[in-house]
């Protein structure tokens, strides 16, 4: 077999392999986020999560309405609001232990609606602390409780 045919066969095999991998990967749920299907509408979900965070003594630093920003730019997108929140008493010791961890705080929860389904999405705690100087033990009574709070507040 000449070089051109070998190269063509190799390219075809790699293409098929990549396609098979992409299909397999698409079927796997992302492991770096925790997603909760809300039993409420979009606005109610945002409101309930904001109130739940504040009721737990955390501060809501910002609400980022991505859809409004898109519309202001002449674009359209699905409803998507990010609630930026945290508790300095919990976050400060983590940032003292690992100053670069400040890039991952404050926490964020995305509320989005696609095809009539409202979801609240937050970074998985293990993914959040991966490649940092923070251990699971450092966050088990703080950051690690956020997915349960979201589930309790809006979960089906």
Question: Would you name each region that the model predicts?
Answer:
Residues 1-9:
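Bacterial N-terminal signal peptides that target proteins for export
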Residues 9-18:
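Bacterial N-terminal signal peptides
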Residues 36-44, 61, 137-144:
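Soluble non-cytosolic domains of exported or imported proteins
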Residues 108-132, 136:
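Beta-strand/loop substructures that line and gate deep hydrophobic ligand-binding cavities in soluble
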